[in-house]
Amino acid sequence: MRHYYITGPERVQAFEETVPEPGPGQVLVRVAFTALSPGSNLHVFRTGGYGGSSSQPEEAVYMGSGVVEAVGDGVTRVAPGDRVASVGVGHQEYAVLSEGQVHRIHGELGLRDASLAYLPTWSVSALHLGQYAAAETVVVVGLGLVGLSAALMADQMGARVLGIEVDAQRAEFARGLRLGAVEQPGADGATEPIAEFLGDAGADLILETSGSWHGFKQAVGMARDWTRIAVMGIYRDLPPGDLALELHGLLYGFPSKFHYQRLQIIGCGSDPADVVAPNPRLATTHRNFAYTLERAAQGKLPLGKLVSHVMRPDDLESVLRRMADGDRSYVGVVFEWQAE
């Protein structure tokens, strides 16, 4: 079977491997689609490893879908023949995953669309952590795949959603999701519709997904009293000096947003895998995944609108290189391993 690895900065190589056997608690999946992470996969491609350049090949693991071929002892949630969405899968023809990494697909939801289900699932966690309440106004800063997934889930949960994206191409793609509004800060005529959408009440919750310090500044600048900023993006580099001073002034200059406006800044990982006492919350990643797939199967969560490109597996390196070179048209990229 083919299995693609990152073998150095901006190098991808396919290896031929034996199809693995599932052990106890594991599931063998015949992969149908894999999807790119615009954050971690691109970071590993650029640097050659998760912690910088590595002497060993690195898997570009993220999300996908496929059909269960076999299960190990003790597996009860899925059976051979089940269609599943998965998280933590590499770009490979077959994958052995733990039972907790696969989630059964119901109804007519296709494998292509289900391959992207992980990011909307993570968005459920972000909305939980951001203390979202129904009918609130949610601003999503950055409309790459993470931001689009978050905006789509917030919209599905009943939020008034305003998408903010500085890139014209991505803003136009985002308008296809039919959110409350999508605006491009800095473009002619954008200020008035943003102010009109937010009204006097302003933003209740801002999901900062860009991973850019400029995006974080945008989020802080849009906050009002008691606004919650839930940070989904990862800031891999230090902010430029001038921008760091601007942020310090916004957050801590008198009257500081952080103190006087009671701004909340929340880091967003995922909900726990299992309910752990004494935490009274029942939200888990498994329940969130089941919810996402259920709503998508019901036609209430159009995951297909997140797909911008369907590619062949051997296009992996060229797609990553185009993304690394700044091509912003690649948003939701999936690789087709098996025809549906």
Set out the residue ranges of the language-model regions.
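Glycine-rich beta-strand-centered segment in the early N-terminal region that forms part
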Residues: 20-36, 47-90
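A structural motif shared across PLP-dependent enzymes of the aminotransferase-like
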Residues: 87-99
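Mid-domain Rossmann-like dinucleotide-binding core that forms the NAD(H)/NADP(H) cofactor-binding site
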Residues: 113-188, 192-193
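C-terminal substrate-binding/catalytic core of Rossmann-like NAD(P)-dependent dehydrogenases/reductases
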Residues: 191-195, 247-307
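C-terminal capping/lid region of NAD(P)-dependent oxidoreductase domains
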Residues: 200, 230, 240, 294, ...
